[in-house]
Amino acid sequence: MSRYRGPRTKIIRRLGALPGLTSKILELESGYIGQSTPNKKVSQYRIRLEEKQKLRFHYGLTERQLLKYVRIARKAKGSTGQILSQTLEMRLDNIIFRLGMSPTIPGARQLVNHRHILINDNTVDIPSYNCEPKDVITVNNRKESVIIKNMDSSRKPKVPNHLTFDSIRFRGSVNQTIDRECIDLKINELLVVEYYSRQV
């Protein structure tokens, strides 16, 4: 399954707020946003599916990519759900988004694909690059205007504790692996792991 490129408001109307997908916030209308129809029984499969979709759309992943991350998390020591979330949070495109250099993760991915981003003074054009503690993220000097425009037009997010951002020098630092408590996406990773339990 390819990466979703359709209307983003359609997704958040169904699944609820996904800050990585879009900065738009929908007001609760006569219908519902991210909620099941009242008095309608929802199957466990659908609940797991929706949690999986939240994760996939928020981080902008294909089905194959998300399955790969689940397999990696299952092989690692510790809580599979927590490791899954931490691994996704340490992707380069997500780090750029969390630093406030782009209003969305798709926008951050575009910055990386266009070779605007450097890690430890080396150009990196792989959005899925796994950032590690002590990594320093900077912007190609010729493209600082793009970052300035992004920062002026987007909401000013609070930079999480595992990151540091110098808005004067456009320089971000990874201090440590993110703690699960600092991930602002409301999701039950265990349900995602259960959804894929027969495929891994």
Curated annotation (Swiss-Prot):
One of its GO terms (biological process) is translation. Residues 90-150 form the S4 RNA-binding domain. Its main location: plastid. Keywords: Chloroplast, Plastid, Ribonucleoprotein, Ribosomal protein, RNA-binding, rRNA-binding. It is found in: Plastid, Chloroplast. GO terms for cellular component: chloroplast; small ribosomal subunit. Gene3D superfamilies: Ribosomal Protein S4 Delta 41, Chain A, domain 1, RNA-binding S4 domain. InterPro entries: Ribosomal_uS4, Ribosomal_uS4_bac-type, Ribosomal_uS4_CS, Ribosomal_uS4_N, S4_RNA-bd, S4_RNA-bd_sf. The keyword RNA-binding applies. SMART domains: Ribosomal_S4, S4. It comes from the Eukaryota. GO terms for molecular function: rRNA binding; structural constituent of ribosome. Part of the 30S ribosomal subunit. Contacts protein S5. The interaction surface between S4 and S5 is involved in control of translational fidelity. Belongs to the universal ribosomal protein uS4 family. One of the primary rRNA binding proteins, it binds directly to 16S rRNA where it nucleates assembly of the body of the 30S subunit. PANTHER family: 30S 40S RIBOSOMAL PROTEIN, SMALL RIBOSOMAL SUBUNIT PROTEIN US4M. This is Small ribosomal subunit protein uS4c. It comes from Pellia neesiana. The gene is rps4.
